[in-house]
């Protein structure tokens, strides 16, 4: 049975409304020479069995290697099957904004719980209902700092994720704000002397990775003290959120804003995304926070309910009063993270974080035995840089053996010491002792 979405009467009614005689009139602005006047060259329709067979054939062309030893902002972690199962529920399976609270209580409650998790892990007072990703959350933090301080300069650590820095530059291009990048030292941490010299009375905020792109746990308390002395805000950006189960919360170390992504919770790597961004800050900055907030309230019958509140985005209020124009965001990804964190619990998250750090130590020992020394001396979580001689060559050779080796740092830091041999490698709970030993011995060979 064929399905015809529009009957001739339907088409006639729509044409009458728009004042057109024929459907072709709607395309009058397109020159005749550019119009296709023949049927599309498509293969005949396939039945379901043939279609799945063709899709499997195409999928088999992909080269897969799981788990990879590459992190660089997107990390391989185990996702419990129940996460995907709950995501498929009809009440949840959308990323769209829950504008009607009376029919969106489930989604709103999940976003409320998401905000709770974000605040618990970051040590902040308030969180919004998620951002697009970690990079845009970082850029929005810089914009918020400018609104709060009235200043037009942002100081960024060179060890912040390079793609976060690129997105930040894109956002600030339209505002005219100045971006000053300060180097990192031999330990992989931000150079505090250079930071102190760069921060002045024009500085709106200082932005550091925590941990940073090099896998190093940066000097957040010291950087926050420098920023505070100049009246600037401190922004911590976390791409590997599992680290927050082991490290001190950014808020406890002096950060005024904590941003990043929860990709590590409930979201597969999926070629780099999508992944939910998070944004948390102090209560005094609540009305300058971008996005929207899910809040708990009571209806006229006295029953607890959830609504969107303090939605200071331009779709809700006047553009000149809005703090952002974030629209339909990563709500479904945020739901996945919320489910995963609920399953882990406080103790489970701490155990997962310790396991990740333990696997990173195991990788470090194995690589040192293989003659590949660590490049940086700073403290690390589950990611670190090794000197493998020729990083690009090692990556290419290991790819032929079905191993994704890591990220050559020279792609982003061509002038850094040991740049040619520097390979950024991550180890998570998915990398068992045998796999780590295989990786190290293969690199050595």
Swiss-Prot record:
Keywords noted in UniProt: Oxidoreductase
One GO MF term attached to the UniProt entry: glycine dehydrogenase (decarboxylating) activity
A biological-process GO annotation: nucleoside metabolic process
The enzyme's E.C. designation: 1.4.4.2
Domain of life: Bacteria
Chemical reaction(s) catalysed: N(6)-[(R)-lipoyl]-L-lysyl-[glycine-cleavage complex H protein] + glycine + H(+) = N(6)-[(R)-S(8)-aminomethyldihydrolipoyl]-L-lysyl-[glycine-cleavage complex H protein] + CO2
Function statement: The glycine cleavage system catalyzes the degradation of glycine. The P protein binds the alpha-amino group of glycine through its pyridoxal phosphate cofactor; CO(2) is released and the remaining methylamine moiety is then transferred to the lipoamide cofactor of the H protein.
Summary of subunit composition and partner proteins: The glycine cleavage system is composed of four proteins: P, T, L and H. In this organism, the P 'protein' is a heterodimer of two subunits.
Record-stated family: Belongs to the GcvP family. N-terminal subunit subfamily.
Record protein name field: Probable glycine dehydrogenase (decarboxylating) subunit 1
């Amino acid at each position: 049975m064929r399905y015809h979405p529009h009957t001739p009467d339907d088409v006639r009614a729509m044409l009458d409304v728009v004042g057109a005689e024929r459907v072709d009139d709607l395309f009058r602005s397109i020159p005749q020479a550019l119009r296709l006047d023949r049927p599309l060259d498509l293969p005949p329709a396939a039945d379901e069995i043939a279609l799945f067979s063709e899709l499997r054939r195409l999928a088999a062309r992909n080269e897969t290697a799981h788990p990879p030893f590459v992190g660089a902002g997107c990390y391989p972690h185990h996702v419990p099957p129940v996460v995907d199962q709950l995501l498929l529920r009809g009440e949840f399976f959308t990323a769209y904004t829950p504008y009607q609270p009376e029919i969106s209580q489930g989604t709103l409650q999940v976003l409320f719980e998401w905000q709770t998790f974000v605040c618990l892990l970051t040590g902040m007072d308030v969180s919004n209902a998620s951002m697009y990703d970690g990079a845009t959350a970082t850029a929005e933090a810089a914009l918020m700092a400018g609104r709060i301080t009235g200043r037009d300069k942002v100081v960024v650590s060179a060890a912040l994720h390079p793609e976060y820095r690129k997105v930040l530059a894109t956002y600030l291009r339209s505002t005219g704000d100045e971006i000053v990048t300060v180097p990192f030292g031999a330990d992989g941490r931000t150079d505090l002397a250079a930071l102190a010299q760069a921060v002045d009375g024009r500085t709106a905020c200082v932005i550091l990775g925590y941990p940073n792109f090099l896998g190093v746990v940066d000097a957040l308390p010291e950087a926050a003290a420098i920023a505070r002395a100049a009246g600037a805000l401190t922004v911590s950006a976390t791409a590997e959120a599992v680290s927050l189960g082991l490290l001190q919360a950014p808020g406890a170390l002096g950060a005024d804003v904590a941003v990043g992504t929860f990709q590590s919770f409930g979201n597969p790597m999926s070629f780099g995304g999508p992944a939910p961004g998070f944004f948390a800050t102090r209560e005094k900055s609540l009305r300058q926070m971008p996005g929207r907030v899910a809040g708990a309230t009571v209806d006229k019958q006295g029953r607890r309910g959830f609504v969107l509140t303090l939605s200071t985005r331009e779709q809700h209020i006047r553009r000149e009063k809005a703090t952002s124009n974030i629209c339909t965001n990563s709500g479904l990804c945020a739901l996945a993270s919320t489910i995963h964190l609920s399953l882990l619990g406080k103790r489970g998250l701490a155990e997962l974080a310790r396991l990740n750090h333990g696997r990173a130590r195991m990788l470090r020992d194995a690589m040192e035995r293989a003659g590949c020394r660590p490049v940086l001396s700073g403290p690390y979580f589950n990611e670190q840089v090794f000197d493998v001689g020729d990083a690009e060559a090692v990556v290419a050779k290991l790819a032929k053996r079905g191993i994704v080796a890591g990220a050559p740092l020279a792609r982003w830091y061509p002038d850094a010491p040991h740049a040619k041999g520097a390979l950024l490698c991550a180890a998570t709970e998915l990398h068992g002792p045998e796999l780590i030993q295989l990786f190290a011995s293969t690199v050595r060979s």
